Amino acid sequence: MAILLFCTAACSDSYLELSPESSVSDEVIFENADAAQYAVNGLGRIMSTQYLDTQGYNGEGTVYAYQGEYPGDVIQKGSYTGWQNLAKGNYFTSSTNSNIHVTWYYYYKLIRNANQILDNCKTGLANVAEQRKWDYIKAQALVYRAYSYTMLSQLYSRRWTDADGLQRGLVLRTTVNNDEMPCSTMAETFELIYHDLDEAISLFTSCGYDRPVDVDKRWMANLDVAHAVYSRAALIRNDWQTVITHSQEARRNYSIMTPDEYKAGFNTANQEWIWEVFEDDTQPVHYYSFYNYMSASCLGSASRTYPPCISKQIVDPIDPADKRLAIYAIPTPEEVGDVSKVSGSGKVTKGDFYNRVKKEFAGRIYSTTTIFYYLSTKFIVKSGTGDGCIPIFRAAEMMYNEAEAQYRLGNEQAVRALLEQTVKPYNADYTCTKSGDSLWEELKAYRKFDLCNEGHSWFDLKRWGDPMVRKTWAEGGSWATYFAEKNTTTGGNYGPADK
């Protein structure tokens, strides 16, 4: 993948490298559409690279782990007591903590690079074929910008329902400049997101270009990705009919992965992945990588010593016949025994469970990985240093998004049908007959379980306004006491927006 990276800016001069020695002039980069496509490819590389000289800061994967999962209610990081503030989201109330600063930096880097491409896109060319190429380039850049503002909004702004879009939004940069700007409203933020996506969809449709059909090119943005971004953005905005429309369009060319594909390690795109973060051994970020923090098979200590573990509260509502459960080391009651004797978050060093996991999961964990109850082996590295692609959008998410929108509109039969479509590939006997609040809880339970580790947990809690409840072993859960939470405050009232 050819790469050209530009300098970046958000709200202050600290984000802008004014005269980098390796800079290439706009005249060279944007000499023609073929050259400009390399710059668009560079946007994909920005999503997986080292940031701020800090391990764990890798771009998109950092957002999924540090904001999406660790502060949520689905995954705990083994017995890593030093991460209590991260796991409890305490850094959300700090204006100086790098864990919240890095996400702002990363997405505005994407936005600035997208803006530099958009500022230089050609229009009105007499050469129709060349103009179509430029339209394709512009459409891709618009998708990256819209996606970046969507992700920034769900982290740094309050929920849409808190003030119907009148609350503080973001700094909306649509050109390459570093001038001071006020924050927009949330409504203005989503007006720009929708505008960018509408234009991108129109350009993708009219230009006649698409990314290659090879699954290893799923890191490239296309029409389907534009619809997927629209689906997620509309979900945040509570724009239910728009969610339904774009969820259906986004997944039109994709199908739910098979049980074998689901258990294959989530490190390579397949028939279900709509968009991905690309990474392999030719472009590794080593110990900075997502897999070094969300896998149990990487040789890094953050993976081996403190592997991710799914919460018992997430597993318990799922039918035991579901084949997806096989990627988690779920103990039997006999293997656990007296819960009062369980150490911390469930570390095990000997006995039947330990021996079973070492044998059954031998190909899914590193040889010296510490064993825990409910150990997650969803993400398996391609190589020991942490290489592997990451799904940004899957067809399943689009179906859960649509189901949530259908529920909000009172279309319960549609919700039941969508749930059955997502679950039956893994449990042929699954039938959903629930209604009302029970149906809502069923939908949330399967969304949490299916999208586990993929960066959705905290964002979902915030959107739903759900309390954070992490039960200890004594309370029927599997959380260590130092990670446990009984926060009855709704998700819309905690997070960076409060600061």
Predicted regions: what they are:
Residues Y80-L155, S184, S202-F204, G384-I390, ...:
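Conserved, well-structured interaction surfaces
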Residues I111-A114, F190, L197, S247, ...:
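Inward-facing hydrophobic residues that define packing positions of alpha-helical scaffold repeats
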Residues S12-D13, F204, L223-E261:
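Aromatic-residue-lined binding/catalytic grooves and analogous aromatic/hydrophobic interfacial grooves
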Residues Y38, I244-P391, A395, D450, ...:
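Hydrophobic-face positions in mid-chain alpha helices that act as interaction patches
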